[in-house]
């Protein structure tokens, strides 16, 4: 997670340093801010993973949308649900506009594949489970509290449905914004986000939704 967070932050910082606008002096060194933001994101990550997100279950989708809207708004984003037969997509836009700058649209998805609990090597596929490899190279469960302790082993892994595909990247994106704010940095490009609710079903309706909201989603890069 930290490697991707570093990439996201450095991309924004590089753009910010090349931008014409000036920023307030950083209040914390960037490496420390990135580490702090990554660590602070773990409780939210665990919370989001606890929400079932079966792509065919409209109630699952609505619960995830509610959580995600609150999380993006907490970072100052403006959000809007895009209607999609009871399983809306979520659009978010950072309101700070940079005159003359490019606009980047980030695509992620929050739905997941159906779960067969008996096929999982843990009690609950929706409960974040911390694991490490034992002497035989097998994954074994350890206390999740370790994730919130003073020392986190980079070789540990969090197992749960959609932990890497694709809820992890969403939480990393939010943590990257937290790190930027902690250093008084702002992206020098305009930021839009589209969160798909049906990627695991082949995104069968995203074309229709995108066409209906062409101007809202307009960007220079995806």
Show which residues each predicted segment covers:
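Positively charged n-region of N-terminal signal peptides that target proteins for export
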Residues: 1-4
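Bacterial N-terminal signal peptides
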Residues: 6-16
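A ubiquitous, low-specificity "background" feature that marks scattered single residues
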Residues: 8-9, 117, 171, 202
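Alpha-helical transmembrane segments and their juxtamembrane interfaces
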Residues: 12-13, 74, 206
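Boundary at the C-terminal end of the N-terminal hydrophobic targeting segment
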Residues: 16-22
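Acidic/His- and Gly-rich active-site-bordering loop/insert found
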Residues: 22-163, 170, 180-189
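Acidic/histidine-rich catalytic neighborhood of metal-dependent amide-processing enzymes
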Residues: 151-222
């Amino acid at each position: 997670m930290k490697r991707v967070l570093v990439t996201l932050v450095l991309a924004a910082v590089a753009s910010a340093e090349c931008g014409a606008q000036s920023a307030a002096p950083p209040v914390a060194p960037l490496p420390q801010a990135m580490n702090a933001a990554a660590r602070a994101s773990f409780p939210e990550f665990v919370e989001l993973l606890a929400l079932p997100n079966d792509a065919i279950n409209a109630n699952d989708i609505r619960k995830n949308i509610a959580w995600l809207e609150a999380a993006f708004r907490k970072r100052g984003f403006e959000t809007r649900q895009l209607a999609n037969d009871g399983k809306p997509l979520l659009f978010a836009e950072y309101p700070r506009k940079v005159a003359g700058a490019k606009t980047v649209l980030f695509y992620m998805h929050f739905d997941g594949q159906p779960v067969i609990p008996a096929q999982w090597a843990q009690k609950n596929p929706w409960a974040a489970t911390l694991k490490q490899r034992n002497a035989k190279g097998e994954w074994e469960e350890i206390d999740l509290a370790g994730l919130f302790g003073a020392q986190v082993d980079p070789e540990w892994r969090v197992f749960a449905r959609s932990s890497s595909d694709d809820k992890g990247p969403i939480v990393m994106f939010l943590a990257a914004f937290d790190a930027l704010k902690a250093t008084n940095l702002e992206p020098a490009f305009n930021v839009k986000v589209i969160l798909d609710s049906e990627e695991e079903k082949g995104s069968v309706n995203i074309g229709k939704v995108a066409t209906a909201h062409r101007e809202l989603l307009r960007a220079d890069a995806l």
